[in-house]
Amino acid sequence: MAVQKSKKSRAARGMRRSHDALTTAAVSVDSASGETHLRHHVTADGFYRGRKVINK
């Protein structure tokens, strides 16, 4: 197992963890169906930018 040579300070620990924050997903509402979806993704009904692109 790897063992550190010396204890890391609280500042070094905090700097390492500064990039670990989670962000919320960008959600949009479709203009045609009013359904929420991820940005730049097709809705579950098959709409993208107000047009039907996938027929189920």
From Swiss-Prot:
GO terms for biological process: translation. Keywords: Ribonucleoprotein, Ribosomal protein. Residues 1-22 are annotated as: Disordered. InterPro entries: Ribosomal_bL32, Ribosomal_bL32_bact, Ribosomal_zn-bd. Residues 1-16 have a biased composition (Basic residues). GO terms for cellular component: large ribosomal subunit. One of its GO terms (molecular function) is structural constituent of ribosome. Belongs to the bacterial ribosomal protein bL32 family. This is Large ribosomal subunit protein bL32.
